[in-house]
Amino acid sequence: MTEWETAAPAVAETPDIKLFGKWSTDDVQINDISLQDYIAVKEKYAKYLPHSAGRYAAKRFRKAQCPIVERLTNSMMMHGRNNGKKLMTVRIVKHAFEIIHLLTGENPLQVLVNAIINSGPREDSTRIGRAGTVRRQAVDVSPLRRVNQAIWLLCTGAREAAFRNIKTIAECLADELINAAKGSSNSYAIKKKDELERVAKSNR
């Protein structure tokens, strides 16, 4: 038998890719059927770090394929002084995920997915102008817009909670995600979502 026949295969089984080397995407469930195509969390989108440097803004709807943790990380880079500091926000998200796991014992990816499902408004109101008068009309919100707005509300809530507070932004982000995943009204995102839906209901 020659050495070629006994050699080990060049590519072994691909290792299970885990976020930050810890969190697996295998057991993450997306319970809202309308958002399954817009929350990119399956094995296909698994990354070690939420930093793929992909061109997701180049084409319409392509950002739906951006891994959901990376979208959260990108949204945390807000308010002038933090623009472009992606390594800082990656570190914040990593710490927040560790805190979530300590407090809940669950996979932080599942907590994030539940928080996004719970904090995306399903109904909103838009301005409609008729003959010089402007009135508001209730409209349904598309799935991609729901995900976008949920991420924005979660990040805004964490940022505002951490401002002039002894708690770090990682702790505030962890609290915001845990409360939103439970559907608790202590969450900024849940409060804002309820407010938007209440205004839309009054404008039906």
From Swiss-Prot:
The modification N-acetylthreonine is found at residue 2. It is found in: Cytoplasm; Nucleus, Nucleolus. The modification N-acetylmethionine is found at residue 1. GO terms for molecular function: mRNA binding; RNA binding; rRNA binding; structural constituent of ribosome. Keywords: Acetylation, Cytoplasm, Isopeptide bond, Nucleus, Phosphoprotein, Ribonucleoprotein, Ribosomal protein, Ubl conjugation. Its main location: cytoplasm. One of its GO terms (cellular component) is nucleolus. The modification Phosphoserine is found at residue 142. GO terms for biological process: cytoplasmic translation; regulation of translational fidelity; ribosomal small subunit assembly; ribosomal small subunit biogenesis; translation; translational initiation. There is a cross-link at residue 47 (Glycyl lysine isopeptide (Lys-Gly) (interchain with G-Cter in SUMO2)). PANTHER family: RIBOSOMAL PROTEIN S7. Belongs to the universal ribosomal protein uS7 family. Component of the small ribosomal subunit. The ribosome is a large ribonucleoprotein complex responsible for the synthesis of proteins in the cell. Part of the small subunit (SSU) processome, first precursor of the small eukaryotic ribosomal subunit. During the assembly of the SSU processome in the nucleolus, many ribosome biogenesis factors, an RNA chaperone and ribosomal proteins associate with the nascent pre-rRNA and work in concert to generate RNA folding, modifications, rearrangements and cleavage as well as targeted degradation of pre-ribosomal RNA by the RNA exosome. This is Small ribosomal subunit protein uS7. It comes from Homo sapiens.
